[in-house]
Amino acid sequence: MKKVLYVAAIAAALAVGGGVYLSSGATAAPASTFVLLDGSKKSTEDLKGQVTLVNFWATSCVTCVAEMPQIAATHEKYKSRGYNTLAVAMSYDPPSYVVNFAETRKLPFSVAIDNTGAVAQAWGDVKLTPTTYLVNKRGEIVKRYVGEPDFAELHRLIEKLLAQA
C-alpha cells in the first residue's frame, strides 16, 4: 500500500509540475508607467514591437549588482535587432544611489525608479531581487526569472523571440 501511495504521490507531483510548465504560456505584461531617471515616462504599451527584458533590482542586492554587466552585455549584443532592456529600481532603493550606479557603470539601457512600489506590485508583487521578465514583441511575458538568469538559456530565448514576426 505504501508503494502505491508513493507512486501516486510522484505521479501527482509530475502532473502538477508538467501542468505548470505547459500552462506557463505568455500573459500580457501589466499596464504600468515607468518613470525613468531623466524624468521621462515609458508605458508597458511602449514595450510592444520589441523584445524587452524588464529587470527589478536594487543597488543593495549583491546578485543584482553582480549580474548587471551580463545584462548590459546582453543589451549591447541584441539592441540592433529590436531588443531593449528596462531596469526598474525597487521603491526602497534611494534614488541618489540608483542614479550614481547607473552613471558610474554607464548602463546602456533605460533605468526607472519605482518610487511608490506600484510597478513591482503590478508585475506580480515583486519582492525578491533580482526578478526579471522577458517580454515578447506583442507585450506578453514569456519568462520570469527570480535570481540571476542562466544567460546562455536567456540568449537562446531572446534569439527565438527576435526571430518571431
Regions found by a protein language model. Give the residues of each.
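Short, ordered coil/turn segments that flank beta-strands lining enzyme active or ligand-binding pockets
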Residues: 37, 47, 137
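Short active-site neighborhood of thiol/selenol oxidoreductases, capturing the structured segment around
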Residues: 43-62
